[in-house]
């Protein structure tokens, strides 16, 4: 019998964390974080990492497992998340895969084989030189022309993922989107229920802006400065939204006000890309979280998940 898996996806600031905890408590679940940046220790504020209090007793996995100086790929995530799903089942509990990093979530749900494609070091160095000469946006534009859907799922700051996508295209002759489409045509190895959370754009964007202000109040600048003072600069971790903008401020390239405004704009754009990515996935059932009675909405989603899992287990 297939192992059960609930995936909860959606844009930043839509409420995935709170929703997943409430559902996991009702369904005897454990949460596997599907966020590519919450794996890093010491990057709590900028990644909106869940606190111990917010976990409310629900076990969470794949958070704080890497130093910011280390890399972490979709293949690494798949290697860690896949056995965790089995382990959670063996404890008699229901695994929840929760996050906004679309490629990471899909790689587990459909067991992508992208990690098996070898590296092309010469081409990688060539692209790194291109970034040094022309910048991350120019590299992202290069991917956008070839594979716009993959580009939509990757922020330009995360140039290492952009390089990997271009590397895969060169090595296989297929875009990441084509590779993923082929994998997605194969049924998931899991008894899967996939939930998407959405919200009216104006409401979501207002939540994002307020979240950024809250991050700054809670110490985002000091958090970024600790990484900055460690000399962590070209690493994958600090290409994340929130840290790249603060580094520009710490370098003296922009004022703090400009950095905060850029962070808000980049976060809104990222949310738009996340929605584009997930809305192209046919197996997602969407729930609108705009101005809802939260407890009633949780019960609605709970009943949907329970019904789907029962239906699929027959």
From Swiss-Prot:
InterPro entries: Dimethylallyltransferase, IPT, P-loop_NTPase. Its EC number is 2.5.1.75. This is tRNA dimethylallyltransferase. Catalyzes the transfer of a dimethylallyl group onto the adenine at position 37 in tRNAs that read codons beginning with uridine, leading to the formation of N6-(dimethylallyl)adenosine (i(6)A). SUPFAM superfamilies: P-loop containing nucleoside triphosphate hydrolases. It is an enzyme of class 2 (transferase). Pfam families: IPPT. Residues 35-38, 160-164, 239-244, 272-279 are annotated as: Interaction with substrate tRNA. Keywords: ATP-binding, Magnesium, Nucleotide-binding, Transferase, tRNA processing. It comes from Halalkalibacterium halodurans (strain ATCC BAA-125 / DSM 18197 / FERM 7344 / JCM 9153 / C-125) (Bacillus halodurans). ATP binds at residues 10-17. GO terms for biological process: tRNA modification. It catalyses: adenosine(37) in tRNA + dimethylallyl diphosphate = N(6)-dimethylallyladenosine(37) in tRNA + diphosphate. The record marks 101, 124 as: Interaction with substrate tRNA. Its cofactor is Mg(2+). The keyword Zinc does not apply. PANTHER family: TRNA DIMETHYLALLYLTRANSFERASE. GO terms for molecular function: ATP binding; tRNA dimethylallyltransferase activity. Monomer. Substrate binds at residues 12-17.
